[in-house]
């Protein structure tokens, strides 16, 4: 198998197949669940809005895909600075049955010089997840932009108990970049290699996925990237990966992200 095909296969196994669109419906989420069961194996998870968790759970169970995790989003997409609301949304997501919660860090507060708020929000949302769900924290690296801010956000999230740090919401002009990924995974290598990394948005093909995986191998070791420590947040990427593996276009995802 070529390196490109190996990257494509691994990226499918590490994918959070995502639909986070304003026009999402039960039917679109059902279709997403079917796409997550790919000819090359199941994706690691799907990522959907909280209200669709029950129908997704029912569909995945019917497909015999109980191993596919259900991720959802809170404090999304703007990363507001109201801790109480972020916690309420996170508790509700867990009550709906989410396995994983992707919460948006209050990145604008950090840009204004407030480091405490982000730490406290992540800490409180981690407590809200308890033992029922893992917490991924979206730092919106494309808006933070400054390497020092990307590093600081990553450090604060890890110190506050995040299980993963994630680049982006996919709702801003600049999403996952190799430059941000290098900073974020360097912080993981320094602080806690059990913390995971999730590039989201803008990873369009197997070659790009391979670049992120290669960076992870260089910074954290060849065997580090597993579903427990690495995810790709993506929708249209799956089509390219299946095409790379010569498995056709059985999985046309929602456009974007």
UniProtKB/Swiss-Prot annotation:
CDD domains according to UniProt: DeoC (cd00959)
Descriptive protein name: Deoxyribose-phosphate aldolase
Residue numbers annotated as active site: 102 (proton donor/acceptor), 166 (schiff-base intermediate with acetaldehyde), 198 (proton donor/acceptor)
Signal peptide: none
Function summary: Catalyzes a reversible aldol reaction between acetaldehyde and D-glyceraldehyde 3-phosphate to generate 2-deoxy-D-ribose 5-phosphate.
UniProt subcellular location: Cytoplasm
Source taxonomy: Bacteria, Pseudomonadati, Pseudomonadota, Gammaproteobacteria, Alteromonadales
The gene coding this protein: deoC
Source domain of life: Bacteria
Organism: Shewanella woodyi (strain ATCC 51908 / MS32)
Functional pathway: Carbohydrate degradation; 2-deoxy-D-ribose 1-phosphate degradation; D-glyceraldehyde 3-phosphate and acetaldehyde from 2-deoxy-alpha-D-ribose 1-phosphate: step 2/2
